UniProtKB/Swiss-Prot annotation:
GO function term, MF aspect, one: hydrolase activity, acting on ester bonds
Source species of the chain: Methanocaldococcus jannaschii (strain ATCC 43067 / DSM 2661 / JAL-1 / JCM 10045 / NBRC 100440) (Methanococcus jannaschii)
Signal sequence extent: 1-30
Keyword list, A-Z: Signal
InterPro entries membership: Metal_Hydrolase (IPR032466), TatD-like (IPR001130), UCP005295 (IPR012022)
Family of the protein in this entry: Belongs to the metallo-dependent hydrolases superfamily.
Protein name: Uncharacterized protein MJ1383
Length: 256
């Protein structure tokens, strides 16, 4: 099992150890731990993931991978400089497997510009992109995200639209992108995720599971708990294997 979206820098070692006991791997992503008043603050955050978090994960035996990028709530003023740094971070460490967490929060002009630049960078580098959708106005902003992507005519379709609900799942699958199901208080319950997987099991190749484990209320066992619920509810083994493991390995090229 792989948890495809966490923020390990917000959790204690005991949580990382618990994940290591249950999961084959996790992906931690850049996010918005504080206001990015300048490029140095953003660099410090990303470099903490690349150095400190890998060291912490190693201590407890957690197989940790990383995505780097500018979260829509954490955009530094020096956008182009940050894009260059993302390139260097990807070259710096093979544990960097994607660009994220990017996306839109309020769909402002600046957010859209930064989002598009990062999608184009993912295209240039042939890397997966992990796209945030907000809790508020999720449907409206998800439509904007899909519209923005459609204008770019990207060859790279390795894009995960995160925190999908039942309605947005259909839209994302219609566009042939990956659906990220987040099992977290305020997003999906394990049973709600099970119902989505059950309804769209014919598209199981395009579904991923995650906990979005962060400083918000979270369940570090969200993925194994959801896998258990899928087994109890009679979802086929091959479907479970795809959404809980295989798709993540294939999409991000994980060495697991």
């Amino acid at each position: 099992m792989i948890d495809t979206h966490i923020h390990s820098d917000t959790r204690g070692l005991e949580d990382l150890e618990l994940m290591a006991m249950c999961l084959d791997g996790v992906i931690t992503l850049a996010h918005d731990p504080f206001e990015m008043k300048n490029i140095k603050v953003w660099e410090a955050h990303v470099e903490k993931l690349l150095i400190n978090e890998l060291e912490r994960a190693k201590k407890v035996g957690l197989n940790l991978f990383i995505c780097v990028g500018m979260h829509p709530r954490a955009i530094p003023p020096e956008i182009d400089e940050a894009l260059d740094k993302i390139k260097s971070y990807i070259n710096y460490n093979s544990r960097v497997v994607g660009i994220g967490e990017i996306g839109l929060e309020k769909a402002t002009k600046e957010e859209k510009e930064v989002f598009i630049k990062q999608l184009l960078l993912a295209e240039e580098l042939n890397m997966p992109a992990v796209v945030h959708t907000p809790r508020r106005n999720k449907e409206e902003v998800t439509k904007i995200i899909l519209d923005e992507i459609s204008t770019l005519n990207l060859k790279n379709r390795d894009i995960v639209i995160e925190h999908c609900n039942k309605e947005t799942t259909k839209w994302v699958l219609d566009e042939e992108f990956y659906v990220g199901l987040t099992i977290q208080p305020g997003k999906l319950t394990p049973l709600e995720a099970v119902e989505i997987v059950k309804e769209y099991k014919d598209f199981a190749d395009k579904i991923l599971l995650n906990s979005d484990c962060s400083s918000n209320a979270s369940d570090v066992l969200a993925v194994p708990r959801t896998v258990l619920k899928m087994k109890i509810n009679g979802i086929e083994k091959d479907v479970i294997y795809k959404v809980a493991h295989k798709n993540a390995v294939n999409l991000f090229g994980l060495d697991i």
